[in-house]
C-alpha cells in the first residue's frame, strides 16, 4: 500500500505519461522513432503537421522523457528513450495486475444514525 504522498507521485507521474500517450499524432511519432533516430524534418514529412504543432508534440514527449533530442547545426534529431518506454509499458501492466483487494468495509455504514420509525 502506498502512503498518500508516494501514491500521489506514483499515479501523478503515470497520469502525465499516459496523457502524453493519449494523442494519435504522438503515438505515430513514437512508432516512427521505434525504428531509430529521426530528424524533425523527416517527422514533419510523415505526420503532416505544421512545424509549430510538431514542436508542441515533441515538447510533451521530451518533458515526459519518452523521447530525447539532440541538436546538430540547425536540425534537431529525436530518439525514443527505450528505458522510459519500458517503464511506461510496466506502468500499464502494473495498473491492471491483480493486487490485494481494497477493503469493502464502508465506514459510512458505522457512522449512520439509527433509523427511527
Identify the residue ranges that each predicted region occupies.
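N-terminal helix-turn-helix DNA-binding core of bacterial DNA-binding proteins
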Residues: 12-53, 76-85
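Intrinsically disordered, low-complexity regulatory regions of eukaryotic regulatory proteins
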Residues: 21-22, 70, 115
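Alpha-helical residues within the helix-turn-helix
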Residues: 45, 56, 62-63
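Beta-hairpin "wing" of winged helix-turn-helix
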Residues: 62-72, 79
Amino acid at each position: 500500500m502506498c502512503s498518500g504522498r508516494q501514491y500521489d507521485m506514483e499515479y501523478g507521474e503515470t497520469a502525465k505519461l499516459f496523457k502524453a500517450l493519449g494523442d494519435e499524432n504522438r503515438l505515430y511519432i513514437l512508432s516512427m522513432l521505434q525504428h531509430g533516430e529521426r530528424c524533425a524534418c523527416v517527422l514533419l514529412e510523415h505526420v503532416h503537421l505544421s512545424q509549430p504543432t510538431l514542436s508542441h508534440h515533441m515538447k510533451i514527449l521530451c518533458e515526459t522523457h519518452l523521447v530525447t533530442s539532440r541538436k546538430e547545426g540547425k536540425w534537431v534529431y529525436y530518439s525514443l528513450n527505450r528505458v522510459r518506454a519500458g517503464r511506461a509499458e510496466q506502468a500499464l501492466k502494473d495498473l491492471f495486475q491483480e493486487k490485494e483487494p481494497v477493503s469493502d468495509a464502508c465506514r459510512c455504514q458505522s457512522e449512520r444514525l439509527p433509523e427511527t420509525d
